[in-house]
Amino acid sequence: MTFRVIIVGGGVAGLTLASAFEKAGIDYILLECRPAFDVAVGASIALSPNGARILDQLGAWEKWLKIAQPLVRWGDRNSKGELIMPRSASTPLAKALTGYDMTFGLRRSLLQTLYDNIEDKSMLLPKKSVINVTCSQEGVAVQCADGCSYEGDILVGADGTYSKVREYMWRLADRDEPGLMDPDKKAMTAEYQCLFGISKASGSIAIGDADFIYDHDRSSFIFSDNCGRICYFILQKMDRVYEMVEIPRFSQANAQAYAQRHADIQIRPDLTFGNLYEHSESSILVALEEAKFKQWSWGRIVCVGDSIHKMTPNLGAGASASIESAAALLNSIKAMFDHSPEEGPTETQIRECFAQYQKSREVRATAIVDASSMTTRLQALRGWFEFLFVRLGMPIMGSFAADMASEIWVGATMLENLAPPKASLRGTLPFNPTQGQGQRESKLKRALLGLPFLALLLVAKTATDAKYASALRGYIWESGGMTSAMGSVPLLQRFYSMKGVGDLWSLRYINYLPDFYETNYESLSQAVSSSIDVGIVMSIWSFESIRRANALTMAQIPTLFTFYGQMAGLGRVSPLYYILYYINSPIEVFKGADMRLMHLNYAIAVLPAIIVSYYIPLSAAFFWPTVSGRKSWLFVWQMHPIWTAITLYLFSRIFPSTVKEDRVHGLRRDLPVIKFSMTVLVIGAAGFWMWSRWTSPSSVARVFFPTAVPSTQAPFAACVCAILKWDMLSTFGSTFLWLGYLIWDLKYAGMMQATWVRVAIYGVAAFVALGPGAAIGLGWLWRENILAHKRHKDAVTEENLAQTR
C-alpha cells in the first residue's frame, strides 16, 4: 500500500512524530523552513516524565540524559528571594514516582538529540518553506518556496504557534464550510510577556537548582545546568489581554529596557536578576500566547503540538505536551494504516482517524493548558486567592508543585505500537490513562451517590431532638442536682474558671449523669462500650488527618467535627464528615503510592495522644473511686477534641518529620505503626464488648439498639439513654456505610477481588464477635493494607501487564 505523511515543522513535535513514523514503518517526509534542525531558537526547554517515557520508547531518552540536567532541588520564594517553605528534592522524587528524572537543557540540544535519533536523514528536508497547500479526494499537495512540490495522503502541521499549515487549513475550510473555523481564529490570546535568556552561573546557585519567585503581577524562575549556565524566565503581566491578530512582537531594544526595569527582582536574598543579566549570553522578549483550539483537523490536514495547544512556560509542560500529541497522532494513524484497504485509506477514514486522535488527546491537552495558565497567575499573585494560597496553603501542602505535576504525568499517552519501557513500570506513581488531568471523577456525581449519609444525618437529627430532655436538663441545672439510684447527686456547676467555657461544658455534662450515676447496668454497659468504640472512630479520623491525600480537605481538621460532636452529638456530625470525605477522596487521589502515606511523626503520636486525651479521662470518669473525682474527670473528658489536638501536636514534635524521605525510600514505613496502634485499640474495644455481652443480663439488641424515638413522657435517664442509642446508631451506621463506599471504590479500581458476600460475612462476623468499634478498626486496616500494596487495574505496571498477556 502506498501511503505517505507530509510533516511540516522540524521542532519537538515534528521530529518526535518523524521518529515515531520511522519506528512504525510508515512512509513520511518532513519539511523544515530553517536551514538546520538544531538552530538556536528559544532558550531552554524542560522535559517531564510524560514526555520522557515516549522518548524512551523511541530510544532517545538515554541520549538526552547525557547532555541534559536533572532537576535536583526545587525552591519557591517570595519577592525578597526568601524560601516560602523548605526546598524539595525534586529529582529523587520524580524518578521514584515515574521512573524518570525531570530534566532541562537547551532547546537546540533536544532538537539535535531527536534529529540524531532518526536513522534515515533523507526524509528530513531543511530550507523548505511552505507557500501553498491544496487538497483533493486523492490526497494533499504542498508547494515550497524553492519550487519543489510534495504529495501525500496526510499533511501534519507541526510548525508551531503561528502555524502556516493551520492557516491553510482554515482557508480551505472557509471555502467549503464557512464559519467552522471562526471561533479558533480568536482562540489565541496573550496576557503576559516573558524575557527568556541564558546567563553564566552564579556561585550561590548549585547545579540542578530551580527557583520560582512569586511577586505581584510578575514572577520569575531560573534553572542551573551542568555547563555553567543559568536559564532564566522573567514574566510580567501586560497592560491588557491581547487577541491573536494584535499580539505584540518585541525588539532587542525592548528586551534590554525590560531587563533593566526588572533588575530589582530578588532571585535569592543575595542575588538580583540584575546581577544575572550582567552576564547574560542571550535573551529574547516575547508575549506568552495561550490557546486551546477546537478544530484540530479538516479534511486531510491535521495539526499537532503548539499549533493546537499553546501554554505558558511556568509548568515546563509544553515540550512534553507536544511529544504526547505526536504520540497520540501516531497511534491513530497507525491504527488506521493497519486496517486500511490495499489502495490506501479513504478521506472518510482519515477524518475518523483525526477525530479519534483529537478525542484521545484533547481533554488532557486542555487540562494542561489550564494548569499552566493557573500556575502563571498563581506565581504572579494575581489576586487575594492566589496570595493567600501561596502564603497559607502551599506551606501546609508542602509538595504542591510535585503533586500538581503528578496530575499531569500520570495519565500520559504513550506509543501503543511499542512496549512500555522497563523504567516506566517501576514507579510508585504508575502511568494510568484513566487518571490525571482531565480524567477526574465528578464531585457532583460523588455528592449524589453520598446522599444516604444525609439521610442518616436527618434521622439522627430527628431522633436525638429531645426537647423534654433539654428542658429537664435546665431544671436540673437550676436545682443544682438530680436524684438517682445512688441518691441525691449534686452538680459540679463550674470546673473551668473561665465563665464562658465553664458554662458551656457544665450544662452539657448533665447529659452524661444518668450513665455515670445510675445503677442501671444496661445504661452503664451501653455507655462504656460505646464510648470505647467511639475512640476507634476518633483514632481513624486522626490518622486520616495526617494522610497526604487529604491535605487541604475537611478531613485534615477532625477537631472541628469532634468538637461539634461533643456539642450536638456525634451522630449528627459523623455523616457530614463522611460525605465530605467521600466527595473529596475518590480512588484517583491514591494514584501514587505516596498519597496513602501518613506523616510518620504524627502517626507515632496518634495512639499515645488518644490514650492520654480520650481513654484515660474516660476511664477515670467512669471508674474513679469517688463521686467528686468522677465528676471532675468527666469535665476533663468532655473537652477531649481539644486535648487530642494539643497532645497529638506535642507528641509529634518529639520525632522528626521524615515524609520527604519516605515518599522516595519508605512508602510503607508508617504501616507497622498504624497496624500496631489500631491493633491495640481493637483489642481493647473487643475486650470491653465481650465483657459487656457476657456480663449483661439483657440482650445485645436491648442494650445497644434503640426501640423507639425518645419520648417526652419518659424519665430523664431513659430519655438520655435512648438519645445515646440513636446517636451511636448514626455514628456507627454512617461509619460502616463509609467503609462500604471505600470498599466500592477499591473494587471499582480492581484493587480488591473479594466478593460483596465475603465482605458482608466478614463484617457481620466481626461486628457480632468483637463489636462495632473493633469491626470498624479492622475494616479500615484492611483497606489501608490494600492501598499500600495494590495498584489500579488500568495502571501500566509489570504486574498488570503480566495479567493481560
Swiss-Prot record:
Keywords: FAD, Flavoprotein, Glycoprotein, Membrane, Monooxygenase, Oxidoreductase, Signal, Transmembrane, Transmembrane helix. It holds the Pfam family FAD_binding_3. The keyword tRNA-binding does not apply. Glycans are attached at residue 132. Residues 1-20 form the signal peptide. One of its GO terms (molecular function) is FAD binding. One of its GO terms (biological process) is terpenoid biosynthetic process. Its EC number is 1.-.-.-. Belongs to the paxM FAD-dependent monooxygenase family. This is FAD-dependent monooxygenase verC1.
